[in-house]
A protein has these predicted regions:
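Noncatalytic alpha-helical scaffold of FAD-dependent oxidoreductases
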Residues: 1-309
Length: 309
């Protein structure tokens, strides 16, 4: 039985859970899972890197199967951008592996510290949803272990119904052992960022439609506390891969880490209102453009360790 706590990023319940390494299981047999976990009710659920919100990957009476130990990238074709890796490989590992060859994840969420299996199980979306769809559209095949069958190789041609159900299946269709995905060809990882400050919700909708047409990536921050004429004010941030720039795929180290869980959240009431006001005015009126590192554009919160506290 493992010592670390296995919990979701939103931390809805913090209790110790049984967990074993998936690499220790040659086959997904309930009796073997129970024996290695030292108990449990016979149920088991895959666990990625604990970056999901809500109560995903909570199986208090059963056993979690940790997909990270021993996870590695098996193959990458720099000509076609097709990669095969274990489910426990992190997006950060994939980026470092493929960026020098001019490739990037076709869909990525707001953190690089998710697993490949977790991305499939949640069918994640990113800032380019309007162009690339969800992550599942880029999955070519899945190697799936089930307790009631032999290991299955699933794709749009082989076991298509199970393949479709596993994408966004939250781990309930079986244990994803590995997956093959397609990547996005990019000139660099540096992002040409365009930020437009808007005064109200009506302005946002007009800007957002234009941004989706012109840019690969688009996302907005809205001041949810603003009222009256300022209702819905915020920033629209759009981006595209710069023609020249960084291609190492190495993100910067965190600036700081939250050491403790405060008894009361500091982001509430007047403090949150003051933060929103300052953040809104951080962007100059009108539109500004600049070049930014990929991790600053895609993963700004990754620079604050344990910010979920």
């Amino acid at each position: 039985m493992s010592e670390p706590r296995y919990e979701s990023w939103g931390r809805p319940a913090r209790t110790a859970r049984r967990a074993i390494a998936g690499c220790d299981l040659p086959r997904l047999l309930p009796a073997e899972v129970q024996g290695r976990a030292g108990g449990g009710d016979g149920t088991f659920l895959p666990f990625g890197n604990g970056r999901s919100y809500g109560d995903s990957c909570h199986d208090d009476a059963g056993t979690l199967i940790d997909s990270r130990p021993g996870a590695r990238i098996h193959a990458f074709d720099p000509q076609t951008g097709v990669l095969t890796a274990d489910a426990g490989v992190l997006f950060s590992q994939i980026t470092r592996h493929v960026a020098p060859a001019g490739w990037f994840l076709a869909v990525t969420p707001g953190t690089q510290f998710i697993t490949l299996g977790g991305a499939i199980a949640n069918d994640i979306h990113g800032k380019n949803h309007h162009r690339r769809g969800t992550f599942g559209a880029w999955v070519e095949s899945i190697v799936l272990d089930r307790s009631d069958a032999e290991r299955l190789h699933c794709s749009r041609d082989a076991h298509p119904e199970l393949f479709a159900a596993t994408i966004s299946g939250m781990g309930l269709t079986g244990l994803i052992r590995e997956a093959t995905i397609r990547l996005l060809k990019v000139p660099s990882l540096t992002i040409a960022e365009t930020t437009t400050r808007f005064d109200n919700l009506a302005d946002y909708f007009e800007l957002a439609e234009a941004a989706d047409e012109r840019h690969e990536y688009a996302v907005a921050w809205i001041d949810s506390l603003a009222t009256g004429r300022a209702l819905g004010r915020g920033h629209l941030i759009a981006g595209d891969h710069a023609p020249e720039g960084e291609r190492t795929g190495i993100a910067r180290a965190p600036l700081a880490s939250v050491p403790i869980t405060p008894p009361i959240s500091p982001l509430r009431g007047l403090a949150l209102r003051a933060f929103n006001e300052a953040y809104y005015r951080k962007a100059r009126p009108g539109t500004t453009q600049r070049l930014v590192p990929f991790d600053q554009f895609f993963y700004p919160l990754d620079r604050v360790g344990r910010w979920n506290r």
